[in-house]
Amino acid sequence: MRHHLFIVCGMLCILSMAVPSKVLCAGKQDAHISYVLKNLSLGKETVAKFRPVLVQYYQEIARVKAPRKALREKYRDAEESGKLTAKQCDELFQSKQKQEAGELEVRTRYYTKFKTVLSTQQAYEAIRLCNDKLK
């Protein structure tokens, strides 16, 4: 019995490593969407109208974050070992600035889109909730 338990645990560990990171990100995105919708306490009709806009928002934020994420992955070993070159540091800094500017542009644009479905107060709260970090 114990032997079977170890085999099952081992297989689950292997399968969890085989799950593509995009699937994990999608799960994280779904959790964030649920968090925002739950905390806004919207009615069913409003949720039905707002959810697609919220999904688009998270897709655009992910698109803006993707280049920096790829660059950080590329330089991960050098960053962790404290051996980044000056050029790499500059690239990482510039990518962070570009990401933050892109996120600001997306948030500003979607605040306006959110207000087409939600009240101004709800749109403000939605943007605030979208920026919360989930554990």
What are these regions (language model features)?
Residues M1-C9:
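Bacterial N-terminal signal peptides that target proteins for export
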Residues H3, I14, V23-C25:
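Short, low-structural-confidence N-terminal segments
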Residues H4-L5, M17, E91:
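Short linear motifs in intrinsically disordered/low-complexity regions
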Residues V8-A18:
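Bacterial N-terminal signal peptides
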Residues V23-K135:
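Charge-rich (acidic/polar
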